[in-house]
Amino acid sequence: MSSTTTTTQTTSQVETKAVSKPLGMRVNGKQWHAPKKAFRPGSGLTSYEKRAKERQLLAAVKAKEKELKDEKEAERKRRIEALKEKRAKKEEKERYEKMAEKMHKKRVERLKRKEKRNKLINS
């Protein structure tokens, strides 16, 4: 019986030690002042559910912004690609016109067909 009372006394002493840890002497010597705590004026004002909801809304907005940005980038790339194709076509046309000045029309047509076949095979 005495062993159970001593164990309850030791557990209560351990609990009090865990709760109130002695801080020791203050460096500045003002032991009569209360120990300072972290200044958090905003803590506890907004609930966790509200913060979680705000985060969710922010994530949705970010996703929408990313979607719009990607869409805009895709449109830009499409325009650039179309412009490159147009320039390449124009360049090829000019090259054939230059060839036509020097060669006969029928021969230029044959070369065109031959080059198109090679393009199809290579691509």
Curated annotation (Swiss-Prot):
- Give me the stretches of Low complexity compositional bias: 1-13
Record key words, sorted: Coiled coil, Nucleus, Ribosome biogenesis, rRNA processing
Segments of this protein annotated with the region Disordered? 1-47, 85-123
The annotated regions of Basic and acidic residues compositional bias extend over 85-102
GO cellular component assignments:
nucleolus
Tell me where in or outside the cell this protein is found.
Nucleus, Nucleolus
Q: Which Pfam families match?
A: Cgr1 (PF03879)
**InterPro entries, per database record:** Cgr1-like
Which processes are annotated in GO (biological process)? Answer: rRNA processing
Question: Compositional bias (Basic residues) spans?
Answer: 103-123
Q: What does this protein do?
A: Involved in nucleolar integrity and required for processing of the pre-rRNA for the 60S ribosome subunit.
The family note in this entry says: Belongs to the CGR1 family.
What's the name of the protein? rRNA-processing protein cgr-1
